[in-house]
Amino acid sequence: MLLKNKTAIITGCNRGIGKAILETFANNGADVFACVRKETEGFSEDIRILSQRTGVSITPVYFDFVEKDQVYGGIKTIISSKKRIDVLVNNAGIASGSLFQMTPLHELKNVFEINYFSQILFMQGISRYMSRSKAGSIVNIASTSGLIGESGTMSYGSSKAALIYATKTIASELGKFNIRVNAIAPSVTRTDMYDQMDEKARNKLIESSALKRPCEPVEVANVALFLA
């Protein structure tokens, strides 16, 4: 029970890596604000069962990361609970794959809006609240695409590169409040997006990885638990 009596916020936790982090944190005793874009019957049932099994509180918070006002609304909902926030995991994001010369500007802007700008906005609001407690941990889910230039990943990779750089800068600023800020950069991971990838592209990514296999969501979740 590494997170017993702690409260975490996890964004984009209805599937894939985010869902694995939600389950791992709940299994380790954390109460969770589970932030997703919209309510679905399946997600509501999943968190009800998980909460019942683990005995922790899981509070859904619904907002669209593209809409600035909704992001502010999500922050307000969480802060109004008056709970101390110990951990924030920024996992919400979208994938995008297209060659540089074929990438329209609106696509690039949309990817950055969700993968970068909304993450910054959310971190600003939550970190101000964390600062009052003089403690906390922020974990950003980035990607190896933000570290290694790969054909067809200009939009996605550059948004994750920006998030990685921001993580370093924010860490240097929030350290005085005893808030740690880290990023995890997984390689290709077995999620629904992985299943939708072109087989040739998927195999190329697997071949470039050290273990010659996709990463499992729970492996990323365990790293997030360590950093929490």
Model-derived segments and their meaning:
Residues L99-F100, E107-F112, Y194, L205:
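Substrate-binding pocket helix/loop in short-chain dehydrogenase/reductase
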Residues R128, S172-K176:
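Alpha-helical segment proximal to the catalytic Tyr-Lys
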